[in-house]
Amino acid sequence: MINNNKIFYSKIICYKKSLEATNKHGGDPPYFNWEEIMKIFLKAACVAAVAVVPSIATAACDSGEIVIKFSHVTNTDKHPKGIAATLLEQRINDEMNGKACMEVFPNSTLYNDNKVLEAMLQGDVQLAAPSLSKFEKFTKQFRIFDLPFMFKNISAVEAFQASDTGQAMLDSMQNRGLQGLGYWHNGMKQMSASVPLTAPSDANGLKFRVMSSDVLVAQMEAMGASPQKMAFSEVYGGLQQGVVDGQENTWSNIYGKKFFEVQDGTTETDHGILDYLVVTNIDWLNGLDADIRDQFLTIFNEVTELRNAESYAVNQANRQAIIDAGGEVRTLTAEQRQVWVDAMKPVWSKFESDVGVENIAAAQKINMAN
């Protein structure tokens, strides 16, 4: 099983500080016994090497256990994805003890979402849960989830994902070596900026951070904004320093990463869904013994069902936490929201050939039932 690594990482910090002390003044270091300097250097180098080489994580597992490394980019205790990943880790390590062990690497400590899929194909990580926008280079089908106002609410999203159309999308990257295991909800997206946003025209001329998605670029351009592609880990600093003026995200992300602290306020638009696809290397999955694979997938599906059912409550709690912390939350009337819909809906036609008109029709049919 996986051991507690706090002492291990504290040693890295101590050795790092010792080294930094030698260069504190930017010139010749203060006096050290050379033998001691070399000891510090070698210890720091060896320990740091262990920390950054992903394969060394196997040393924390019992001999003979299958190692499952799960890399994601969020925190572990306030974010729907982080909470789900931690629960999955706990259940795998409890129920598959002796057969498999899982270690979760949150907050981009192992890979960010832009690099994790390539690492997965190379066998350096077994599980990841990037946002659906991150799969553009592998398939265009998931673009339907980025189209603004495509889904009425989270219930419509879930119904579409559970449909034959949504389930078929899980297999859409098999020819590229990736297998989707299931969708994890974050929630509906909201808009925030350095100025109040009540109409799309308020975003005219502003720089908005977007994920690497052509759909989201077109969405921001439809408002007259300037889209800026930026990694999730860089967003807070970008907003704080004025590199970008605004962003779109869920309540969990806005609160968990404290984006509301460096924005004028957040407008409750519910204009899109931010969900994740839990994905694995298909060769790794198929290479597991049947009993191991079946138990792993059973646990995964149970965690997915439980956490997706609770994701709405998590987001609402984070929305309230923003208000309690002094953040501004602006709601729209039905008439105000329709102005946003009218401004963004033309984006659909630009991506019909990628998404499929039949899939758009299926999504709208589901909207009517939800």
Predicted regions and their residues:
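Short, low-complexity disordered leader/linker segments with a strong preference
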Residues: 1-67, 370
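N-terminal secretory/targeting leader peptides
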Residues: 34, 60-156, 165-167, 173-370
